[in-house]
Amino acid sequence: MATSKLQALWNHPAGPKTIHFWAPTFKWGISIANIADFQKPPETLSYPQQIVITGTGLVWSRYSTVITPKNWNLFSVSLGMAVTGIYQLTRKIKHDYVYEANSIVAKE
């Protein structure tokens, strides 16, 4: 039974014999790096980088569900990229607009 499931995975159109498996698998590195950046101070985050990570995640999440065969590996990594990008953008916006505004009011 396990052998037949492994054989089905191996021969799948988006299986390990194709770029459709390996590209999303290596794309996890971007999401992992973005998660590692959760520890960085928000002032070091880049708006353009996080906007691109979020946008890429959203676009490819949608694409991965409309292609045939559906590529769930691509969907999951893209969703992860979108979520981590949104989180980082939220941190950056809070730092730049909420905390900065509060510190200006406190100084006055």
Swiss-Prot record:
Family indicated by similarity: Belongs to the mitochondrial pyruvate carrier (MPC) (TC 2.A.105) family.
UniProt gene name: MPC3
Tissue specificity: Abundant in leaf and particularly in the guard cells.
A Pfam family per the record: MPC
Compartment(s) where it occurs, according to its Swiss-Prot or TrEMBL record: Mitochondrion; Mitochondrion inner membrane
InterPro entries: MPC
Name of the protein this chain belongs to: Mitochondrial pyruvate carrier 3
GO biological process: mitochondrial pyruvate transmembrane transport; negative regulation of anion channel activity; negative regulation of potassium ion transmembrane transporter activity; regulation of response to water deprivation
Segments crossing the lipid bilayer: 19-35, 51-67, 74-90
Protein's organism: Arabidopsis thaliana (Mouse-ear cress)
Gene Ontology CC annotations of this record: mitochondrial inner membrane; mitochondrion
